[in-house]
């Protein structure tokens, strides 16, 4: 009897307590998802309304585990966004409805502006006044940047007629609270997810389920076996760059470039994979971005959901490339600064955005003036790749560093203290780490057609082969992660 009481107490403690490390690859979530999924499969055969309500309830539980009491922000934003968008569409077309659109977008932005940017704004204001005021640190609701942008995209798409009609409240709530997308996206358009939510799912699409399992396996490998391992040395470098040699600093920058890709694309794979298991097909968020030969191509391959969001809801409304060459450059530059601010209220993210903005402007200028017409051979492609990857890695320094002093110290060490002796010492001290980084880059260099071939081979293999591969990966994750997978980088945004 005592054991049952203790078990029940532990169960209710789990249900009623926040977990700051809660995400798609933590073991408590995996256990919860197995129970959820078993019931979901059973419910899916009956009324769709019950299934939707069940998924929404689990999504809100997911939000509570990640955010605690701040989870109430999600249903508040959802309901207010839905009602205001419906009200906006009842307004007279023209200037009145346009004003309504502005009011709805501002209302959707208010929680994000308050929780993410109010302290930063106050700090700037008091620095200008030279006062000693220090605002209290404010907790940032996990995923707020993602579900806010998703709400805005729905409102604008309804206004523009890109999505034919406003959804029912239960469908919109499902769309905005869908738990795989909640913590770190990818930001998903209404036209992608809502039609699938509104369509009954009587039969399981086996190929989609197997694709989901493939993506989950890829996501676990990327995050738990690659990104978290590489992060160990990266953290040493960025916490105290002066304690490492110039070559060690250079390797830390290379390591973080690899880490952030495998960390974030790993989460995207997990999110898209979990959604696929449930019968929902989402768009890819990454397409081998470090294979890019210029910065424009990089942004067509990196965090595709965010880059296309800024293209459609900021760059094009600002005029895009329709108002002359100078305006095109300015629009690109402004879009990247806002992208930097989206990541966080910090001068470091602004610098990261400025660097990408400058890089995009330079590439557009060269392309518009015929300066990018160089011989198309493996040597020029290699040089283009090296310049692009190096520039992106340089920008990552400001993205990862805690402050400008850390970033400049690291860059100064790389430029002035590198030596062959330091390189040899590093190779002797961190051979396994370097091997993992180089192997990871080699994996990333795979052709998209070869990746698709591997995926199709997995999908078409027997269930026993799939089960064995999944079991081996899970065992590796358990053994190598020491039962503690680190939080995803993008959960802080």
Residue map of PLM features:
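Membrane-embedded transmembrane alpha-helical bundles that form the catalytic cores
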Residues: 2-492
């Amino acid at each position: 009897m005592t054991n049952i009481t203790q078990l029940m107490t532990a169960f209710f403690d789990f249900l009623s307590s926040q977990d700051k490390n809660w995400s798609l690859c933590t073991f408590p979530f995996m256990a919860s998802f197995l129970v959820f999924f078993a019931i979901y499969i059973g419910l899916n055969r009956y009324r769709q309304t019950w299934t939707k309500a069940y998924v929404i309830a689990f999504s809100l539980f997911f939000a509570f585990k990640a955010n605690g009491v701040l989870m109430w922000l999600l249903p508040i934003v959802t309901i207010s966004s839905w009602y205001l968008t419906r009200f906006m569409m009842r307004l007279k077309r023209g200037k009145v409805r346009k004003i309504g659109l502005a009011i709805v977008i501002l209302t959707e932005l208010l929680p994000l502006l308050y929780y993410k940017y109010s302290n930063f704004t106050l700090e700037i204001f008091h620095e200008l006044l030279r006062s000693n005021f220090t605002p209290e640190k404010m907790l940032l609701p996990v995923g707020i940047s993602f579900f806010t942008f998703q709400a805005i995209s729905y409102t604008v798409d309804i206004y523009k007629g890109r999505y034919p009609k406003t959804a029912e409240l239960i469908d919109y709530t499902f769309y905005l609270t869908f738990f795989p997308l909640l913590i770190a996206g990818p930001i998903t358009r209404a036209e992608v997810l809502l039609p699938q939510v509104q369509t009954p799912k009587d039969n399981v699409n086996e190929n989609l389920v197997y694709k989901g399992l493939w993506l989950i396996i890829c996501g676990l490998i990327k995050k738990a076996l690659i990104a978290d391992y590489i992060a160990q040395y990266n953290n040493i470098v960025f916490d105290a760059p002066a304690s490492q040699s110039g070559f060690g600093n250079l390797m830390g920058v290379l390591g973080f470039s690899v880490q952030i890709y495998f960390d974030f694309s790993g989460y995207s794979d997990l999110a898209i994979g979990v959604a696929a298991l449930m019968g929902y097909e989402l768009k890819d968020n990454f397409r081998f971005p470090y294979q890019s030969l210029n910065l424009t191509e990089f942004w067509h391959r990196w965090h595709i959901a965010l880059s296309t969001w800024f293209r459609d809801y900021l760059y094009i409304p600002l005029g895009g490339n329709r108002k002359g060459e100078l305006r095109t450059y300015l629009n690109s530059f402004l879009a990247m600064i806002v992208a930097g601010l989206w990541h966080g209220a910090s001068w470091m993210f602004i610098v990261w955005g400025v660097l990408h903005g400058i890089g995009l402007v330079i590439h557009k200028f060269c392309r518009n003036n015929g300066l990018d017409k160089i011989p198309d051979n493996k040597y020029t492609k290699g040089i283009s790749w090296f310049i692009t990857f190096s520039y992106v890695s340089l920008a990552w320094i400001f993205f990862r560093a805690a402050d400008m002093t850390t970033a400049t110290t690291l860059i100064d060490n790389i430029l002035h203290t590198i030596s062959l002796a330091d390189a040899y010492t590093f190779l002797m001290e961190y051979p396994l780490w370097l091997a993992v980084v180089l192997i990871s880059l080699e994996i990333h260099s795979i052709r998209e057609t070869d990746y698709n071939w591997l995926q199709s081979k997995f999908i078409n293999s027997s269930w026993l082969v799939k089960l064995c591969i999944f079991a081996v990966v899970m065992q590796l994750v358990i053994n190598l992660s020491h039962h503690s997978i680190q939080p995803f980088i993008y959960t802080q945004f």
